[in-house]
Amino acid sequence: MRTIHFLLPALCAASCMASVQAATPADLLKGYSAEARSQQTGFTPSAQRGAAFYARTFGVSAKMPACTSCHTDDPTKAGRHVVTDKPIKPLAPSANPERFTDLAKADKWFGRNCKEVVGRDCTAAEKADFVAFLTGGR
């Protein structure tokens, strides 16, 4: 019985932590959009700008000049990392429901990929546009 008294609060805390991390692509889009609006009055995410960003050749890296280098021209299709040759699940949440459901994970990958491909951190506006493109603005 004593074990249950200690175990129950730990389980409740763990489930609360998991629900804090759970998100939807719409939640991430709202968050990045709000951050962008705090930097640019009147900002509205644009799937069209996100598509252009996705297809743009940045040229920072010869091996990874664009998002499409690893993620293919179609974000609903699986990709492959051009350096490690590891498979990459589709970016679009319509093809991969796990995408953009964890803010920490999304921020980690934006941080890593933006530096490697774009050559700098992506702005909140770029992230919002990118998510708008991949989710159809939903």
Question: Residues of each region from the PLM?
Answer:
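Electrostatic cytochrome c docking/interface patches
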Residues: T24-G59
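Bacterial N-terminal signal peptides
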Residues: L8-S15
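Short microdomains enriched in Cys/His and/or Lys/Arg
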Residues: I88-A104
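The canonical Cys-X-X-Cys-His
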Residues: A62-D74, F130
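Bacterial N-terminal signal peptides that target proteins for export
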Residues: M1-L8
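Short cysteine/histidine-rich zinc-coordinating motifs and their immediately flanking basic loops
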Residues: G79-K86
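C-terminal capping alpha-helices of c-type cytochrome domains
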Residues: D107-R138
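Sec/Tat signal peptide C-region and signal peptidase I cleavage site
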Residues: M17-A22
